[in-house]
């Protein structure tokens, strides 16, 4: 079972919007055993004994009112600490694989809730945007947290994603939240409502122009931009090459550009050049909206 990489926020949709794309995938393999508890082996990056996958299973078992014996192997091919939802995708892939192996029928919101609560191990607090997209696929809007209400769209969108090879920022999520403004003006509030409305309407209509309007942001992105390597040059070069919009992927340092298929390669080359001129190594990919891990259980 596999779950895709994701990009949360997309500008104005801070903490309530994420998209699943086929840039990278996390994979999980499950074997049911006797007894109760989860034994997890990680191939590649090992997050340690207190990890998102383990916590996600604990929350799921608690919600289902039963414990299973599980051996899990997780292969996470999503770059770690890059704003691409790597920890959430690994948890979602493992839960989806378990549900299929155990022959269970579990509501998607229950899986998202368990994986989102499991994110405390990686981010220090629950996060549902990335895990919702990894589970459901497409573009997901969190309409409510309590109770958890998710709305999925499946727009045809293409992105160019730049993933810089830089050292992980210590306590990245905490730092990137600490720089956010505590108050905004009423004018900014109204403008931001208009943008997030355009973002959701763009998802619903599969309209890149509306999505691009929604990816503009004057609240979160300006505060975080100084902490994202090459942000200014990458954004400028991408827009000059024909990108429709550019924003930070999650809390960064990856950057995501909305593009048209006809000029995706041109934008990709422009983003690559921007990183080179900044003296940074980076992997740049063209990616499309994709389905999530739970779609494989249908």
Curated annotation (Swiss-Prot):
**What Gene Ontology terms for biological process does this UniProt record contain?**
threonine biosynthetic process
Keywords from the UniProt entry: Amino-acid biosynthesis, ATP-binding, Cytoplasm, Kinase, Nucleotide-binding, Threonine biosynthesis, Transferase
Amino-acid biosynthesis: is it a keyword of this entry?
yes
Q: In which pathway does it act?
A: Amino-acid biosynthesis; L-threonine biosynthesis; L-threonine from L-aspartate: step 4/5
Q: Which GO-annotated molecular functions does the record name? A: ATP binding; homoserine kinase activity
Q: Where in the cell is it found?
A: Cytoplasm
Gene Ontology, cellular component aspect = cytoplasm
Reactions catalysed, as given in the entry: L-homoserine + ATP = O-phospho-L-homoserine + ADP + H(+)
- Which residues are listed for ATP binding in this entry? 79-89
Question: Which Cys pairs does UniProt list as disulfide-bonded?
Answer: none
Q: Which domain of life is it from?
A: Archaea
What is the uppermost EC class here?
transferase
Which Gene3D superfamilies does the record cross-reference, listed alphabetically?
Answer: 3.30.230.10, GHMP kinase, C-terminal domain
Pfam families, A to Z: GHMP_kinases_C, GHMP_kinases_N
Q: What EC numbers are recorded for this enzyme?
A: 2.7.1.39
- Annotated function: Catalyzes the ATP-dependent phosphorylation of L-homoserine to L-homoserine phosphate.
Q: Which family does it belong to?
A: Belongs to the GHMP kinase family. Homoserine kinase subfamily.
Q: Which HAMAP family match?
A: Homoser_kinase (MF_00384)
What is the designated name of this protein? Homoserine kinase
Q: Which organism is it from?
A: Pyrobaculum islandicum (strain DSM 4184 / JCM 9189 / GEO3)
């Amino acid at each position: 079972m596999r779950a895709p990489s994701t990009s949360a926020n997309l500008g104005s949709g801070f903490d309530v919007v994420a998209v699943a794309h086929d840039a990278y995938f996390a994979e999980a393999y499950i074997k049911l055993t006797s007894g109760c508890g989860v034994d997890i082996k990680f191939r590649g990056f090992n997050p340690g004994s207190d990890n998102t996958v383990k916590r996600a299973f604990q929350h799921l078992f608690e919600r289902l009112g039963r414990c299973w014996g599980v051996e899990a192997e997780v292969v996470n091919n999503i770059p770690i600490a890059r704003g691409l939802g790597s920890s959430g995708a690994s948890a979602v892939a493992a839960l989806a694989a378990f549900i299929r192996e155990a022959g269970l029928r579990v509501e998607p919101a229950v899986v998202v809730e368990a994986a989102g609560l499991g994110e405390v191990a990686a981010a220090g607090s629950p996060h549902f945007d990335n895990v919702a997209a990894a589970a459901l696929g497409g573009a997901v809007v969190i309409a409510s947290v309590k109770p958890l209400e998710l709305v999925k769209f499946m727009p045809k969108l293409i992105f160019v994603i730049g993933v810089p090879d830089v050292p992980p920022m210590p306590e990245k999520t905490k730092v990137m939240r600490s720089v956010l403004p505590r108050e905004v003006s009423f004018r900014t509030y109204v403008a931001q409502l208009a943008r997030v409305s355009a973002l959701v309407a763009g998802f619903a209509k599969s309209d890149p122009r509306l999505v691009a309007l929604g990816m503009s942001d004057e609240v979160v992105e300006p505060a975080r931009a100084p902490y994202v390597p090459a942000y200014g040059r990458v954004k400028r070069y991408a827009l000059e090459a024909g990108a429709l919009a550019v924003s930070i992927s999650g809390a960064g340092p990856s950057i995501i550009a909305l593009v048209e298929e006809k000029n995706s390669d041109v934008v990709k080359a422009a983003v690559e050049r921007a990183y080179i001129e900044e003296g940074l190594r980076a992997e740049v990919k063209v990616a499309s909206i994709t389905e999530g891990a739970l779609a494989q259980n249908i």
